[in-house]
């Protein structure tokens, strides 16, 4: 079997089977949602930018939003034979990358993304077993389909495993 490495861009999602890896870079206020099925060794990763699609009239990319991307990722994994009840989640990102004196104007998008991702996963009844969220550092997230291990490369900190 070939050990593939799949890259997921911003506002994108994808799947990889064992022994492959799937990764996303540039997680600032964005969130990486890693879903893993231990039985089938299928890994899914989503890189969301915004919490809620209902604020927009024309949604051209559902993968941009937590409320749409997570159900879409689950459906793609189910189409490959996963059972939703076997999925576990690990999340990373949601940093406050900029300091604004008046947060009411822009809101803390990182914090809102964290809340939206947790809400969506809870509604889908998928347990978050590990997280590294908040703070003010950018992250790269790598999910290994062999064992579900997530490796984070955090700017100014180094490597963290979830």
Swiss-Prot record:
GO BP annotations listed: chemotaxis
GO molecular function: protein-glutamine glutaminase activity
EC class name: hydrolase
Reaction(s) catalysed (UniProt annotation): L-glutaminyl-[protein] + H2O = L-glutamyl-[protein] + NH4(+)
Keywords on record: Chemotaxis, Hydrolase
Enzyme Commission designation: 3.5.1.44
CDD domains for this protein: CheD
Pfam families: CheD
InterPro entries registered for this protein in UniProt: CheD-like_sf, Chemorcpt_Glu_NH3ase_CheD, Cytotoxic_necrot_fac-like_cat
Similarity comment: family membership: Belongs to the CheD family.
NCBIfam families: PRK13490.1
PANTHER family, sorted: CHEMORECEPTOR GLUTAMINE DEAMIDASE CHED-RELATED (PTHR35147:SF1)
Role this protein plays: Probably deamidates glutamine residues to glutamate on methyl-accepting chemotaxis receptors (MCPs), playing an important role in chemotaxis.
This protein's name: Probable chemoreceptor glutamine deamidase CheD
Origin species: Clostridium botulinum (strain Alaska E43 / Type E3)
Record lineage: Bacteria, Bacillati, Bacillota, Clostridia, Eubacteriales
Record gene name: cheD
């Amino acid at each position: 079997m070939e050990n593939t490495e799949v890259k997921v861009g911003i506002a994108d999602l994808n799947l990889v089977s064992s022994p492959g890896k799937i990764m996303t870079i540039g997680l600032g206020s964005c969130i990486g949602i890693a879903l893993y099925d231990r039985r089938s060794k299928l890994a899914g990763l989503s890189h969301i930018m915004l919490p809620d699609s209902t604020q927009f009239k024309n949604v051209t990319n559902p993968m941009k939003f937590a409320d749409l991307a997570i159900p879409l990722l689950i459906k793609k994994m189910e189409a490959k034979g996963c059972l939703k009840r076997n999925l576990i989640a690990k999340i990373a990102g949601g940093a406050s990358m900029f300091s604004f004196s008046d947060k009411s104007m822009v809101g803390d998008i990182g914090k809102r993304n964290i809340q939206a991702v947790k809400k969506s996963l809870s509604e889908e009844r998928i347990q978050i077993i590990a997280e590294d969220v908040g703070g003010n550092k950018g992250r790269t997230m790598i999910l290994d389909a062999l064992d579900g291990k997530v490796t984070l490369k955090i700017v100014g900190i180094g490597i963290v495993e979830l």
